[in-house]
Amino acid sequence: MTTPTLLRVGLDIGGTKTEAVALDPNGRLVGRLRMPTELGAERVLATAERAVRGLSFQTGRPLSAFASIGIGIPGAVDRETGEVRHAFNLDLAELQLGRLLSELVGVPVRVENDVTAAALGANHLLELDGTIAYLNLGTGLAAGIVVDGAPWRGAHGVAGEIGHLPIDPNGYACPCGQFGCLETVASGSAISRAWPHGGEHPAQDVVRAMEAGDVEAAAVVARLVQGAASCVRVLALSLDPQSIIIGGGLRLLGEPLIGGIRATLEQWAEQSSFLAALDLPRRVRVLPKHSSAAAVGAAIIGA
């Protein structure tokens, strides 16, 4: 009798939706589902359990066929204990997510920061080698780093926290306590502050206004583009990666952002032979629109 193949499960728990995937031993996607994330510690746990059981139903496999579960989630993550703290967009102050979910479904669980998981997933899905940097342009700003297929976190686990690199000491206050950080320029929260009348989707609204000829909107978008291009330059000069992958919700702005980043990098290259030699525009890649990178990366981490 042939032993059934064990699957690896990955969850990407975000503030609005949770995505779950199942990978076979070769890393191929054999199951995927999405569902709304319910907020609050108990409901986040319930969402995670429902996602795992949903994958079991979808794949026609019992929970015992799942070798491991990895979870990518925002907030402060203790990778040793599986505890999550200060995940504000999930209305979650503290949750022993790894231990409690494992008790509910009977499968080992590992928990990781969502950006690190997305970096690992992007590296896998795009079949990249060497050193890659994943630039997450979302509500906040951070990067994940992968070296030879493994996440690199640094000595204290803060490698890639470029959102808290100050570039203007006279700039806006950052939640980290500093002033003028990159996150105050190149993030969804920065756009919300600069374009407060943009409704529920200020980034999309400001781009539409720019395209309609609004001068103020054009200045907001230009500041975002300059900040994002600066992030690419920082990652290139500090890590020298083969590829810099742009992910996060802001990437869905498309050409106004991505084309603007490349144009800015090209302009800088014209002004600096040093930057020109680095060929930064060629290194920039964009995560596809419907990519499951964070969930796939979580599945890999869970193994």
Give residue spans per PLM region.
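Short hydrophobic alpha-helix segments
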Residues: 33-35, 88, 155
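A charged helix-plus-loop insertion that forms the helical arch/lid used to bind
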Residues: 82-93
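Glycine/small-residue-rich loop that forms an oxyanion/phosphate-binding "nest" at active or ligand-binding sites
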Residues: 110, 116
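Short beta-strand segments
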Residues: 12, 68-74, 112, 134-140, ...
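A short acidic/small-residue loop/turn micro-motif
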Residues: 36-39, 92, 158-161
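ATP-binding/phosphotransfer module of carbohydrate and carboxylate kinases, centering on a glycine-rich
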Residues: 1-68, 78-81, 103-107, 121-131, ...
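Glycine-rich phosphate-binding loop of actin/hexokinase-like ATP-binding domains
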Residues: 130-185
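Short, glycine/acidic-enriched loop or turn micro-motifs at the edges of active sites
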Residues: 15, 117, 139
